[in-house]
């Protein structure tokens, strides 16, 4: 039960952070994620936001110890890898893993129709103004923490 509550609190905290970051962008950023008109944060700000999210979640759950930096590093690698898999996946990658490539989907196709997007879609639908990359980052953080909690407790 404790593990479940910790996981929920991490997701809720991450969702709040995602909403706050989303408030600084245009209201229509996520209406059409694949649209050329959609605005994105510069790479430097995106990386900074990722680091802040990882540090906040690590400090909130582990306190200020050396394990905090270790978990932050693990989460950074995890969310960066997840982001690459979701958004920069080539046509040659297997469809069963991530669904059709994003640039080959029709307008009516959902961006969240694969198992890997379940957590991200929940956060994104809850916070309509939050950019999808935040939801993807939170998905990766949640995945790492679920593994961490599972093997720790």
Give the residues covered by each predicted segment.
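Catalytic phosphate/metal-binding cores of nucleic-acid and nucleotide-processing enzymes, i.e., regions
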Residues: 2-153
């Amino acid at each position: 039960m404790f593990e479940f509550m910790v996981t929920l609190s991490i997701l809720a905290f991450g969702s709040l952070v995602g909403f706050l970051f989303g408030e600084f962008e245009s209201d229509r950023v996520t209406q059409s994620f694949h649209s050329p008109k959609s605005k994105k944060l510069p790479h430097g700000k995106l990386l900074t936001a990722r680091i802040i999210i990882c540090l906040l979640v690590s400090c909130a759950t582990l306190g200020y110890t050396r394990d905090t930096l270790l978990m932050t590093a693990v989460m950074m690698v995890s969310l960066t890898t997840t982001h690459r898999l979701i958004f920069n996946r080539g046509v040659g990658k297997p469809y069963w893993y991530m669904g059709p490539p994003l640039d080959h989907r029709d307008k009516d196709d959902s961006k969240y129709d694969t198992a890997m997007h379940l957590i991200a879609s929940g956060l994104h639908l809850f916070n309509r103004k939050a950019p999808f990359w935040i939801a993807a980052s939170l998905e990766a953080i949640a995945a790492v923490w679920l593994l961490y909690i599972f093997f720790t407790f």
